[in-house]
Amino acid sequence: MLSPKRTKFRKQHRGRMKGIASKGNTIAFGQFALQAQDCGWVTARQIEASRRAMTRYVKRGGKIWIRIFPDKPVTMRPAETRMGSGKGNPEFWVAVVKPGRILFEMGGEEITEEIAKEAMRLAQYKLPVKTKFISSDINLSSDSSGEGKTGKDSKEEVKK
C-alpha cells in the first residue's frame, strides 16, 4: 500500500476541505480519467482496491496512472482508553481529495472508451467520494473537410 517513506512530523491536524481542487484537476497522462465530485479522505487501502479492480478488468491492455497519494496520517486512540494523555498513534494514511481532482487516469492503444468507462466504474465503487468519468478531447484523425490541405493548395486545385 502507498505511504510516505518519511515525513517531517509524525502527526497532523485533521484540517478542513474548503473549495475546489486547484492542482491536479486536468488530464495529464492518459486519455480517460476519474474525477472527484465532492471532498473526502481516500485511504491507501481504497486506492489500492480501486487500482486492483481496474487492473483486473483491463488486464494488460493499457496503462493506469494514480494521481493521488496518501500523505496525511490519521491517528487513533486505542479502544477503552480514558480521555486525555496526548494524541493517538498514526493508524493509516489518507489522501485529501477536493472536488475536481483527478484520481485515476487510463490510456493505451488497446483501451477504448467502453473498456475505460467500465474499469473506472468498478474503481468508483471502492471509493468514498462521488466521482465522474471524463475523457480528453484529443482527436488524432485528420480534418475530413480539407483532408489536411491548406487553403492555398485547395485554391490551386479549383483553378485546374
Curated annotation (Swiss-Prot):
Disordered: annotated segments: 138-160
GO biological process terms, semicolon-separated: translation
Record field: compositional bias (Basic and acidic residues): 149-160
GO MF annotations in UniProt: rRNA binding; structural constituent of ribosome; tRNA binding
Keywords of this entry: Ribonucleoprotein, Ribosomal protein, RNA-binding, rRNA-binding, tRNA-binding
InterPro entries: Ribosomal_uL16 (IPR047873), Ribosomal_uL16_bact-type (IPR000114), Ribosomal_uL16_CS (IPR020798), Ribosomal_uL16_dom (IPR016180), Ribosomal_uL16_sf (IPR036920)
Entries under PROSITE patterns matching the protein: RIBOSOMAL_L16_1, RIBOSOMAL_L16_2
Assembly notes: Part of the 50S ribosomal subunit.
Function of the protein: Binds 23S rRNA and is also seen to make contacts with the A and possibly P site tRNAs.
Family, as annotated: Belongs to the universal ribosomal protein uL16 family.
Protein name according to UniProt: Large ribosomal subunit protein uL16
